[in-house]
Amino acid sequence: MEVQAEMEPTSSISLVAAVSYGIASMAMVFINKAVIMQYPHSMTVLTLQQLATSLLIHFGRRMGYTRAKGIDMATAKKLLPVSIFYNANVAFALASLKGVNIPMYIAIKRLTPLAVLISGVLFGKGKPTTQVALSVLLTAAGCVIAALGDFSFDLFGYGLALTSVFFQTMYLVLVEKSGAEDGLSSIEIMFYNSFLSLPFLSILIIVTGEFPNSLSLLLAKCSYLPFLVILILSLVMGIVLNFTMFLCTIVNSALTTTIVGVLKGVGSTTLGFVLLGGVEVHALNVSGLVVNTAGGVWYSYAKYRQKKAKPAKLMSDLEAHKK
């Protein structure tokens, strides 16, 4: 009975982390799209999001709202690859949104579970169960079918989105490893990630030519209240998304985090068709998205069965969020 009582909070946290990440991820796609439609400097937006994250956690530590540790150089060196892959993923994802409509962007990003599954085998995590492997393959097949029905096909945009998939795979695998091996909490990983991102992003906005034009345009745009509201919402949701993503990856796994991204795509895709338009609906497009969703549901069922068959392990990450 004591073991059962211990397992229940862990299962609850796992579910809350997954659902929270799904909601935040879905909202962030639309918010980023809304910002970029009015302000095309995606690297500057990403820099502002990371700066806001660093400042919030720093002052949160000073005021005693979180027990996250300060910057340690040895840990920073170990997490530097996470930061590089994370920012490369977001940078390519933001850039791809300029040429890819939201439903197809979501479909392409649904290739990430397959990439994570393959990387897990290559990095020695062992072979997945047959049901998990088949459900992930079904999800990837849905992406291909949906792409065949996309009449607004943008080769460059697709290339950027696929590159984003690679970088997302790498940083999720590294985050899962860092949480398991180094005992870092989601807030600590988020703090290191945002802090280490700032020099990299500062150089990037200069090299890409965004700065200083992006700054002058930003100041001019901020005088327009609707844009200012969307920008602030983007900064807040960037923090929420990072926290829920890292928490979900540590509490669950990198593969589960990507599958949550697949399941939240149902709502994102529907809203993308209705609200933002720019999509010529075709039977292949719709069929592919349905297959995507079926693969995600199948995966969820397979992992549920797998978790019931194994004792759930307690996560040290929970202690980091207690005052």
UniProtKB/Swiss-Prot annotation:
Expression (tissue specificity): Widely expressed with highest expression in roots.
All ranges on the Cytoplasmic side of the membrane: 1-10, 59-78, 125-132, 176-186, 248-252, 302-323
Membrane-topology annotation of the record: Multi-pass membrane protein
Lumenal face of the membrane: 32-35, 98-101, 154, 208-226, 276-278
Subcellular location: Golgi apparatus membrane
A Pfam family it matches: TPT
Key words, A-Z: Golgi apparatus, Membrane, Sugar transport, Transmembrane, Transmembrane helix, Transport
Residue spans crossing the bilayer: 11-31, 36-58, 79-97, 102-124, 133-153, 155-175, 187-207, 227-247, 253-275, 279-301
GO molecular function: UDP-galactose transmembrane transporter activity; UDP-glucose transmembrane transporter activity
Domain of life of the source: Eukaryota
GO cellular component, one term: Golgi membrane
InterPro entries membership: Sugar_P_trans_dom, TPT_transporter
Disrupted gene: phenotype observed: Early proliferation of lateral roots as well as distorted root hairs when cultivated at high sucrose concentrations.
Annotated GO biological process: lateral root development; root hair cell development; UDP-galactose transmembrane transport; UDP-glucose transmembrane transport
Biological role: Nucleotide-sugar transporter that transports UDP-glucose and UDP-galactose. Plays a role in lateral root and root hair development.
Family: Belongs to the TPT transporter family. UGnT (TC 2.A.7.15) subfamily.
PANTHER family linked: SOLUTE CARRIER FAMILY 35 (PTHR11132)
Protein name from the UniProt record: UDP-galactose/UDP-glucose transporter 7
Source species of the chain: Arabidopsis thaliana (Mouse-ear cress)
